[in-house]
A protein has these predicted regions:
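A conserved ligand/cofactor-binding region detector
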Residues: 1-271
Length: 271
């Protein structure tokens, strides 16, 4: 059953308040002045101001879910084609015009800021678009639905044309930290992988096989708020990044080699 939701009034904020938020995040969250800010830094300041609103609504949504003790839906997918989030979130919040006014008061256009945002390279096919639509629809309808996937480091590829031929380059879409992703390190998962089974006996002479030379894969989750159009409901998309590994046994050089290979599950390019 969908949880009852309220619509968000678009007049909850004014351009002055929003501009103060943007200035705060640019100066203190990012650590630069406007005069020294890159286009991406400006985008990030705007995005953090929007995320502030999203997280307030997200906490209210979670409290509503807890009080109603409603069942939850978890959607697992290898791909989530969510596109660019700044304009989508502003439209869903009914705050686009106010943010555009704040941007003009600062001497810039919101459309220029929005075009700085890279597409979230979390897939390359219909599977990812379908998954993103499901999350958006569930949030719009007030359904407690959450997505789980992989936080890929690279996209499909970045195209260059050299001497009339296509050259494929790595798509480092996460070269800069995403302002939409909130690291949830307290929920990290430690997964033992690889290794071998060695026969053995315990002190009583009973057969006791041991798992040897295994490695630990650390999955660190990052949550992205997912808001439905015009709704108060904000769910999340949880994406896991392979952070590091450690070898349970063996020389230090072997552990270092394993550690270098650690990000492979999330660094794989989507083809």
């Amino acid at each position: 059953m969908p949880v009852t939701q309220n619509r968000i009034p678009g007049t909850a904020l004014d351009s002055k308040t929003i501009l103060e938020r943007i200035r705060f995040h640019l100066r203190y969250s990012i650590g630069v002045r406007k005069e020294d800010a890159t286009p991406y830094a400006l985008f990030k300041a705007f995005a953090l101001a929007v995320r502030q609103e999203l997280l307030d609504l997200h906490h209210a949504t979670q409290e509503r879910y807890r009080e109603s003790q409603t069942k939850r839906v978890y959607y697992l997918s290898l791909e989530f084609l969510i596109g660019r989030s700044l304009e989508n979130n502003l439209i869903a919040l009914d705050l686009y015009d106010i943010f555009a006014e704040a941007a003009r008061e600062w001497g810039i256009e919101l459309s220029e800021i929005a075009n700085t945002e890279p597409d979230a390279a979390l897939g390359n096919g219909g599977l990812g678009r379908l998954a993103a639509c499901f999350l958006d629809s569930m949030a719009t309808l007030g359904v407690p639905g959450f997505g789980y996937g992989i936080n890929y480091e690279y996209g499909l590829f970045r195209q260059q044309i050299r001497r009339g031929y296509q050259v494929e380059m790595p798509d480092h879409w996460r070269m800069e930290d995403s302002p939409w992703q909130v690291e949830m390190s307290r929920d990290a998962l430690y997964i033992p992988v690889y290794g071998r089974v060695e026969d053995g006996v315990d002190r009583d002479g009973n057969y006791n096989p041991m798992w040897m030379e295994w490695r630990i894969l650390v999955g660190v989750p990052y949550d992205m708020p997912v808001i439905g159009y015009g709704a108060k409901t904000v769910n999340y998309l949880r994406l896991y990044t392979a952070s590091s590994t450690a070898c349970a046994a063996g020389p230090r050089c072997r552990r270092s080699a394993h550690r270098r290979r650690a990000p492979a599950p999330t660094a794989a390019r989507r083809r």
